[in-house]
Amino acid sequence: MVQKKFCPRLLDYLVIVGARHPSSDSVAQTPELLRRYPLEDHPEFPLPPDVVFFCQPEGCLSVRQRRMSLRDDTSFVFTLTDKDTGVTRYGICVNFYRSFQKRMPKEKAEGGAGPRGKEGAHAPCASEEAATESSESGSTLQPPSADSTPDVNQSPRGKRRAKAGNRSRNSTLTSLCVLSHYPFFSTFRECLYTLKRLVDCCSERLLGKKPGIPRGVQRDTMWRIFTGSLLVEEKSSALLHDLREIEAWIYRLLRSPVPVSGQKRVDIEVLPQEVQQALTFALPDPSRFTLVDFPLHLPLELLGVDACLQVLTCILLEHKVVLQSRDYNALSMSVMAFVAMIYPLEYMFPVIPLLPTCMASAEQLLLAPTPYIIGVPASFFLYKLDFKMPDDVWLVDLDSNRVIAPTNAEVLPILPEPESLELKKHLKQALASMSLNTQPILNLEKFHEGQETPLLLGRFSNDLQSTPSTEFNPLIYGNDVDSVDVATRVAMVRFFNSANVLQGFQMHTRTLRLFPRPVVAFQAGSFLASRPRQTPFAEKLARTQAVEYFGEWILNPSNYAFQRIHNNTFDPALIGDKPKWYAHQLQPIHYRVYDSNSQLAEALSVPPERDSESDPTDDSGSDSMDYDDSSSSYSSLGDFVSEMMKCDINGDTPNVDPLTHAALGDASEVEIDELQPQKEGEEPGPDSENSQENLPLRSSSSTTASSSPSTIVHGAHSEPADSTEVGDKAATGISKPLPPVPPSICKSTVDRRQTETGEGSVCQRTYDHPYFEPQYGSPAEEDDDEQGESYTPRFSQHASGSRAQKLLRPNSLKLASDSDAESDSRASSPNSTVSNNSTEGFGGIMSFASSLYRNHSTSFSLSNLTLPTKGAREKTTPFPSLKGNRRALVDQKSSVIKHSPTVKREPPSPQGRSSNSSENQQFLKEVVHSVLDGQGVGWLNMKKVRRLLESEQLRVFVLSKLSRAVQSEDDARQDVIQDVEISRKVYKGMLDLLKCTVLSLEQSYAHAGLGGMASIFGLLEIAQTHYYSKEPDKRKRSPTENVNTPVGKDPGLAGRGDPKAMAQLRVPQLGPRAPSATGRGPKELDTRSLKEENFVASVGPEVIKPVFDLGETEEKKSQISADSGVSLASASQRTDQDSVIGVSPAVMIRSSSQDSEVSNSSGETLGADSDLSSNAGDGPGGEGSAHLASSRATLSDSEIETNSATSTIFGKAHSLKPKEKPASSPVRSSEDVSQRVYLYEGLLGRDKGSMWDQLEDAAMETFSISKERSTLWDQMQFWEDAFLDAVMLEREGMGMDQGPQEMIDRYLSLGEHDRKRLEDDEDRLLATLLHNLISYMLLMKVNKNDIRKKVRRLMGKSHVGLVYSQQINEVLDQLTNLNGRDLSIRSSGSRHMKKQTFVVHAGTDTNGDIFFMEVCDDCVVLRSNIGTVYERWWYEKLINMTYCPKTKVLCLWRRNGSETQLNKFYTKKCRELYYCVKDSMERAAARQQSIKPGPELGGEFPVQDMKTGEGGLLQVTLEGINLKFMHNQVFIELNHIKKCNTVRGVFVLEEFVPEIKEVVSHKYKTPMAHEICYSVLCLFSYVAAVRSSEEDLRTPPRPVSS
């Protein structure tokens, strides 16, 4: 599953292996490399010299008497894996025995005096018997058809003859092998059999031309020369000519084009069409299973289901496994089958399908300390006498069908139930289906004709979607082997996605970084705690490297078939890997290896002559010596190995002498002369269909040279129409359960999909995100409609091409009116991130906070919804119609808490959930209000508060309101968090709440952290920064009066006597919550956010406006949004090294204007009818508030919050301290805090203070709250889990996890400088949180050695870069001298980000759909009105931007692939949006101005004038456009160009001609039309920018009016 690099070669090498001088005296010889093609090594893949041992694992065997057996003509597969890069190459080998004759006296002179004379003299002359091989290697291998193979040995009983007494004949093993990066096993095998047949046929043809020479000797000669045993110069010109053409055939085969996954197939004609059909090479697209070109169910047949699952358990749990068998083919394919069966997991350790017996020191690989899967021949351990098998290796004997456990093996855990029973049932059904007489559904010939069986397909679809998943029945696929393989893989995927195995896996992963490669932490403890049934198997599986790597791979998966299976798509026609299911949908490339003008055609047409003379070997072995070379024919395996050991086989890596061709002079003549048509043949032939079917036509069309192939690139001709028809039929059948979708809708989607990816139908691409729905055991208890949505693939899409249905929301939000029309969120591109449209696999009590935890990493959250692909965007109206869905917009939110139970519980009604959630929030608001007013929590409320705070989202909700720091926009960008003074009464109430929160965190930790524990960062920030002073005058002050501390003033004195400050703090916005229509449970929070990932515009009758207590004059002033959200503190975006974490409160401005269009990043939802722009910080209040804090209800049109610097999960950011330390020092400056009592001291059990204080403390304590220090602080796993949760939240807040697939793709496309900047951002985020983690652990008096160990482990786990890791190490080095509050808290990077959001309408007026356009640091994000990311336009892709103040329309030109697209938006704040984007782009350009120059202006392009047909050059210069043709030259000045655009490959230029005062249109046909248009637009932008800057310099400053 590793993303493999594209290899431009279909075949890397073709080699011939055997013995150059076969010996009749020994059973086995050292195998030698006899021929290799090409002669030179490829730079990135030299030919490994030990390939000879893999081709002949037990040596080059020889035998005297031939006995035909299944091993006489065999093929098998091996792999060669590069130990440095991990790249795997496949070897496909065909082994056969060619006969040779013992050296006779008359042959001594045969060598002549040539350079190989001596060698030839010792070479035994052989009469070739290879042409007689026709037996198959078993049911799994298919050599060529009977008509293409000589049949001399087809009837051994009738072929028995006595041998001539003067001939003692031997046969020697010979191997033909192909090495390739591509696993086309069956087709490569056919190529090798074809090569063998060509040599055999040429040998047969020579029999009639040399009547004086015995037939056997003459037939021998061809193979002896081909294998290098005889000199070329001595042989006849006819033989050399044949060999030359055979070698030219090999080189043409090596130059075959490579198929493109999901787009192009290659049809290779290796022999004339009437002799053998063309071989098809095709790769499935990523939405299908990866190609497995062998019987994957083979281990199930050989071992049985139970034993096979036992071996799979060993493999999954990382035990060492060795398989052995006499049959190489069964051995290697079984190993590869086991590896393929664990998909979507990947085996992370060495895999060697075939380890040769005769290779020296091969047994040392079995001593490796790591797990492995290795296949060895049955002779391996007998041959390695001195080797002792390690006592921890599981041995699987495929011949005896036994699994032998090692001596000290631990007992394998049994697979969990009921999943195990289901898996066994499905596997047995799949195997049983092969014994039935039912016909397979799909027919290969009909597929090539573009036909299908819609009746069966439709029935399958209806059955599939109307029955529970446990009714899965592989019999529906028919009884063909390929469908059984698909059924086997489907059963395994469904097993992994079951509740007791890996379902819900991604809920427990935390993305730590994406660049330079993804790093994901897997929280195994919470994962195991979420299993419905605790099993040893799941516990051990969770600790394996395969599961850990799966978390990284799933961020940007290279294959999506498992997601389609999770969405109940099982049909092989949709997910199958074999070309017969999809080849008809691909563009064909026809390539001819065989030249019909070659004289090889004559040899192929000669009927094989079979007489008694031509069969010198008795198949029955009935003459004097009953001796066979095959190990299977020995009385025992030991006898065979004993004979092998008598032979002198050198198993060391051989030193290969430079080889030559058998007859061909130089390969270059083949490559240049013969393959030139491939470069030119881009257009389809005039009648490519006929040229395939009619040999005379093809022959006449390729009249170049006798050895030159005619390479034909077929056009689409009639196939696209047929494949569209197939797609339509398939789509119609599949979408039958969705009656509202007319066939025309799916058809339009099919057409678009074909043009995009070449795959038949977008309707087939319906896979949900992994591990969401329960697949095994009892079905989840849900409402019928919700379960239907969860299990029903949605293929519908608007006929107009809109993407409205691609914008997902939880199923509970889907209303009955639009659930059918709602489509999947995935784009049709194979590389698109796949988003899930269901949250039903996990518990019903989901809230604002928990959803972020659940969705943070890939495609779960709205923030990560797939962006549309090119095809999805190219519509007449580029934006979807979102009208009609607005009722569902309420409560659409990103999640904060990712953990939740996997097993579903019966949820209460939506009204009940919404009511409970609102009541809980309102209750906690009142408690917080009471605390901030100095009235405390209250004895009667304490029990309920404790119970409610067991929910992480409610913990964050309360902590966000407790944090009492006021900030301005400038304060938000400061680095150090200021202390906050509160009154003693407020202190007491806050301490009670914090202690309740700690108790609830203890409860969460006891349940393995389910629900998340990042709130501890917010709690400890409050504890470290909030204090009361013991001075008498300060003890009489108001509870929250002094929170606003201006920079440079003593925090203890600032704000005194300021009534407004008191009013602000006393009136947090505690309006009642809007009832949630879709709450997941009683603890749900109805939260909304302008956050980049999760903006939600909620409109509807359920929304209740908040209640404000402020007077009219106060409404217009800046207020503290007490319920603004909090987000995790993280790395600062600033460049100075000491930028640190803190939190900032959302400042809310309530505007009385109904037309207000400014809203600065609040945690609130904007009214959908108002035209707003939000100056949103990416931090806590805006970004973070979306994650962790519950905000007040939706604002009305006039209630818009502004908060440019937003709060974080840790509460609000505090005012800057009067004295800042230099950036190099992490330690806080010393100050007089002797009279201050901080909240953290109460958490530790305060040991200072008067007796009166202690008595008062005791009186304030409740029976349920302990004064002692919690033991939670000593649990290192708790700190690790809290850190991982915090990283996830901060990444969400900074927009680092919005569509990880797109982010990774962009990273790979950037230059080195930009990549480094992105890596630095991630390092800074991680270092900031690690710094704060150290500070909090110090605060709670954690053992300092434990701090060092844990932080260093987390630092290594996060792969923090050298610069930032050095900073953390410096802090750890000073740890001995640090205590308590000595280490300052760094502010979060999310709070340093500033984003502005504007409400826009698609099109030129307000009739267009509403979108929210967010202007970020490096891109513009377009969100739908439910907060889903619709588009993300990176600044490097924007070409031009203009606006019209009169029409209020903004025009954006952007580069989309190779095309330039124009998008128009209407907004009342058109001018502000324009300058906002312009300023942001200028800042982005300034970051790389000195390092990365922009693209050069202008360029030259070939064009053809549409009027005259004349060709020429179009030059774009700074002065204008210059057109050069053969007979004339035209120059068009820049100021005369009125318009330019492209229309289907035609560049249209409109020129204003001053002489005639008219506009003249010029049209030029060119394949570079888009490049020309792009170049002209860049030129206009450049000229406009230059003129603007010049005007600014000339314009004098205006006098200021008095």
UniProtKB/Swiss-Prot annotation:
Residues 430-564 form the dDENN domain. The modification Phosphothreonine is found at T1040, T1045, T1194. SMART domains: dDENN, DENN, uDENN. Pfam families: Death_MADD (PF23629), DENN (PF02141), PH_MADD (PF25328), uDENN (PF03456). Disruption phenotype: RNAi-mediated knockdown in hippocampal cells leads to neuronal cell death. Residues 157-166 have a biased composition (Basic residues). GO terms for molecular function: guanyl-nucleotide exchange factor activity. Interacts (via death domain) with TNFRSF1A (via death domain). Interacts with PIDD1. Interacts with YWHAZ. Interacts (via death domain) with KIF1B; links the motor KIF1B to Rab3-carrying vesicles in anterograde synaptic vesicle transport. Interacts with KIF1A. Interacts (via uDENN domain) with RAB3A, RAB3B, RAB3C and RAB3D; the GTP-bound form of the Rab proteins is preferred for interaction. Guanyl-nucleotide exchange factor that regulates small GTPases of the Rab family. Converts GDP-bound inactive form of RAB27A and RAB27B to the GTP-bound active forms. Converts GDP-bound inactive form of RAB3A, RAB3C and RAB3D to the GTP-bound active forms, GTPases involved in synaptic vesicle exocytosis and vesicle secretion. Plays a role in synaptic vesicle formation and in vesicle trafficking at the neuromuscular junction. Involved in up-regulating a post-docking step of synaptic exocytosis in central synapses. This is MAP kinase-activating death domain protein. It comes from Rattus norvegicus. The gene is Madd.
